[in-house]
């Protein structure tokens, strides 16, 4: 059961030293109880108090790390069932599935296709992060290890779908340094699989024929000292899988049952084998409803664009606007004599506009104003993107650095042109297009 602020306060040193950033120990205790701060941020907390508080104040869902280096990812650590209650913290990761039942040509084709989906959206890299390597019932250790080694060459974090401890041990010998997930523990083999995963130092995936068996198996693994787990909630059909995934998350977060407080794997290949359209639809469902690792047969651009866009929208903090730093961004080799274009600091606006400006090839200085992370029309309506804010920023930040006196403003705020001309004497105010897609033609026409 989570502690409240008063219970935490009783164990604090009560110095009111402010070194944690809070004015009093009571304020610090309240923030710890709300999950806004960690108990370790108090520099004067005794070891005994830390030991008693750390477990009680930890998130009900454990944070699990997989992979290494650039391919390291964090799963779990969630504290709320719904994004609007606070925020989601660990986005789901998508995996493309390989299997020993495939021939070499099919495996090679899949491995060659995975790197093709790799692009940036609003400053975030969108790519297939994981490869799920499944061991079919008729495969031996040599065949499975060869497939794992081939998949490892792609440089993505691996998830090993294998229930045979000896085969799993052999496969881990070639990939354990990359910190993969070993997804294969169940009620009949969990002791042996636990030994293999613990020896290799990797995360262990656990499954069960139903939630009761899954719960008992996880509890048994915890008794063995292993809390580095993920739960495979894939059931016999879509309905059961959805129910399993939601009930596991609700048990952990609402009922505070830490036995189910682990990230989830959802294997869509088992639910809709060969139906790529249905898999994409289900991936969107489990992106919103609690899948931590989502396994699919493929990830093409047609599937990636909506899925990654959905994931990015759901897994942003609703309490913080998506914004970029205000400043001057030279594009296409711009210098002090290059044209000045201005817009707001809303991240989506910035990346769309800057992308079109770069595509034009015209050297220019993109000036980003502090508009509170709002879009052009919203910030204008709120008074955050006004002739006053723009002119003051131009005078203080731009005029000392840029000699060009031509300023392009968004077409949607053309009404600001007159005021800006009055407040920025010596500047030529040019009304740009209303849509970013029109910028390339607009800039080329200006140069003509």
Residue ranges of predicted features:
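N-terminal amphipathic alpha-helix/helix-capping segment at the start of soluble metabolic enzymes
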Residues: 2-14, 47-111, 328-333
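Local cysteine-cluster metal-coordination motifs and their immediate loop/turn environment
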Residues: 13-31, 40-44
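Conserved mixed alpha/beta catalytic, RNA-binding, or beta-rich assembly cores of soluble enzyme
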Residues: 34, 82, 92-412, 418-420, ...
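Terminal amphipathic helices with adjacent charged low-complexity linkers/tails
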Residues: 44-49, 176-177
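Glycine-rich beta-alpha loop elements in corrinoid/cobalamin-binding modules
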Residues: 423
């Amino acid at each position: 059961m989570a502690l409240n602020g008063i219970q935490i306060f009783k164990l604090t040193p009560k110095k009111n030293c402010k070194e944690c950033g809070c004015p009093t120990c009571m304020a610090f205790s309240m923030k710890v109880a709300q999950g806004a701060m960690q108990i370790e941020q108090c520099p004067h907390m005794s070891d005994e108090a830390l030991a008693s508080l750390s477990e009680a104040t930890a998130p009900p869902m454990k944070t699990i790390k997989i992979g290494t280096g650039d391919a390291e990812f964090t799963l779990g650590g969630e504290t709320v069932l719904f994004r609007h209650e606070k925020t989601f913290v660990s986005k789901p990761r998508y995996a493309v599935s390989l299997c020993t039942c495939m021939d070499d040509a099919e495996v090679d084709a899949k491995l060659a296709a995975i790197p093709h989906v790799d692009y940036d959206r609003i400053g975030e890299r969108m790519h297939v992060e994981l490869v799920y390597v499944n061991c079919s019932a008729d495969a031996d250790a040599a065949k499975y290890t060869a497939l794992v080694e081939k998949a490892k060459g792609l440089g993505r974090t691996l998830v090993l779908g294998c229930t045979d401890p000896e085969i799993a041990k052999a496969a881990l010998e070639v990939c354990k340094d990359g910190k993969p997930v070993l997804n294969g523990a169940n009620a009949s083999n969990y002791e042996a699989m636990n030994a293999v995963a613990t020896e290799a130092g990797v995360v262990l995936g656990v499954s069960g024929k139903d939630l009761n068996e899954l719960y008992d198996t996880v509890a048994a693994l915890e008794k063995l000292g292993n809390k580095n787990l993920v739960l495979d909630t894939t059931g016999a059909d879509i309905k059961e899988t959805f129910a399993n995934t939601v009930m596991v998350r609700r048990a952990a977060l609402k009922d505070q049952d830490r036995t189910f407080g682990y990230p989830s794997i959802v294997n869509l290949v088992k639910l809709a084998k060969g139906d790529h359209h249905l898999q994409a639809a289900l991936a969107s469902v489990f992106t919103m409803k609690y899948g931590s690792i989502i396994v699919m047969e493929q990830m093409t651009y047609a599937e990636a664009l909506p899925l990654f866009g959905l994931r990015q929208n759901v897994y942003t903090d609703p309490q913080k606007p998506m914004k970029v730093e205000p400043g001057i961004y030279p594009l296409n080799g711009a210098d002090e004599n290059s044209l000045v274009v201005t817009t707001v600091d809303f991240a989506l606006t910035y990346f769309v506009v800057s992308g079109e400006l770069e595509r034009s090839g015209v050297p220019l200085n993109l000036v980003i104003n502090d508009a509170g992370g709002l879009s052009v029309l919203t910030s204008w309506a709120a008074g955050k993107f006004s002739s006053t804010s723009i002119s003051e920023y131009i005078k203080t930040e731009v005029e000392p650095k840029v000699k060009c006196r031509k300023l392009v403003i968004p077409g949607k705020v053309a009404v600001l042109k007159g005021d800006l001309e009055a407040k920025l004497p010596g500047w030529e105010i040019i009304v740009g297009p209303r849509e970013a897609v029109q910028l390339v033609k607009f800039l080329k026409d200006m140069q003509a």
